[in-house]
Design a protein with these regions (language model features):
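Beta1-alpha1 glycine-rich phosphate/pyrophosphate-binding loop at the start
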Residues: 1-33, 117, 125-148
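A conserved FAD-binding loop/helix module that cradles the flavin
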Residues: 128-130, 241-275
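Glycine-rich dinucleotide-binding loop and its adjacent helix/turn
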Residues: 87-132
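Short, well-ordered coil/turn residues at beta-beta hairpins
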Residues: 75, 81-83, 88-90, 121, ...
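FAD-site-proximal beta/loop scaffold in flavoenzymes
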Residues: 96-112, 202-252, 260
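Solvent-exposed alpha-helices and their adjacent loops that cap or buttress functional pockets
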Residues: 58, 70-72, 95-97, 109-114, ...
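Phosphate-coordination loops involved in phosphoryl transfer and adenosine-cofactor binding
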Residues: 49-50, 114-116, 235
């Protein structure tokens, strides 16, 4: 088995990983390094560093990939664990705080910022759901950015949850990065905030699935490669795992789907692609 690792995990911006059973509190780079060391114990596995640029399936059903350095590799089965990228809003001061004080998931990072002043920055209509959830971790202000207005039911929930609503757009994040001290609004207000949650839109981190002709499912924040129970895509012999193949993303889900894809790929080599 050949593993081609581009070295660009989605969570590389975070100081520590959370919500990943058995790995809680570890830096993402350490998790990857530990995994690489464990793989090295298996003589049937080869791991190389590199970026895969192209992938194709020949008439016999065999797959061929080309790396950025021009080298090529071929295989009977292909597992895409190419991941996704978070598309951040163009707000001054946001990118340099991503993964530290600007966060995407309360289930991954909520405990670490609990009982502090929390904010939710709207980037799409579903951000109202995040604003309703976040008060379980601390006092919450929802910044609508004039993107969305709550309906009657949502407004009642926000009120019941004690969420403060600010409709004047956030124009700047204040404080020594990666820390946040406050948010400056267009109307001149400065609102103290310790951590800011954003449900960022996402995009594929690689176009390999598109090159191969894989089907996709549309989600509220982006797309995911369509897979079956064994993580096989719409292209026979191509499997997908991790955030690229799920509309609900988390390191534990990604790891579990990798197990399913590996088992599915192996079973297909023994029993055939239709088994």
């Amino acid at each position: 088995m050949l593993v081609i690792d581009a070295g660009q995990p989605r969570n590389r911006f975070a100081e520590h990983a959370h919500g990943f059973f058995g790995q809680d509190g570890k830096p993402p780079a350490r998790i990857v390094a530990d995994a690489a060391a464990q793989l090295a114990a298996y003589p049937t596995v080869q791991r190389i560093a590199g970026e895969t640029r192209t992938a194709e399936r020949d008439a016999s059903g065999r797959f061929h990939v080309t790396l950025a350095d021009g080298s090529r590799a071929s295989a009977d089965r292909l597992i895409l664990a190419t991941g996704i990228r978070d598309v951040l809003p163009a707000l001054p001061g946001l990118a340099e705080r991503w993964g530290v004080s600007v966060l995407h998931c309360p289930y991954c990072h909520g405990y670490e910022v609990s009982d502090r002043q929390l904010g939710v920055l709207a980037t799409h209509p579903l951000s109202v759901h995040q604003a309703i959830l976040i008060p379980d971790w601390g006092p919450t202000t929802w910044f609508t950015q004039r993107i969305v207005e709550p309906n009657e039911e949502e407004a009642a929930l926000l009120d019941a949850r004690g969420v403060r609503i600010e409709r004047s757009p956030v124009v700047e994040i204040l404080g020594d990065a990666p820390r946040i001290d406050a948010l400056r609004l267009a109307d001149g207000q400065v609102v103290p905030i310790d951590a800011l949650f954003i449900g960022a839109r996402t995009e594929m981190a690689s176009d390999l699935a598109q090159q191969l002709g894989c089907a996709f499912d549309e989600g509220p924040l982006g797309v995911a490669i369509r897979v079956d129970t064994w993580k096989q895509t719409s292209i026979p012999g191509v499997f997908a795992a991790g955030d690229a193949s799920s509309l609900m993303t988390n390191a534990t889900f990604a790891s579990a789907s990798g197990v399913a894809a590996g088992v599915g790929a192996h079973r297909s080599l023994i029993f055939g692609l239709d088994a």
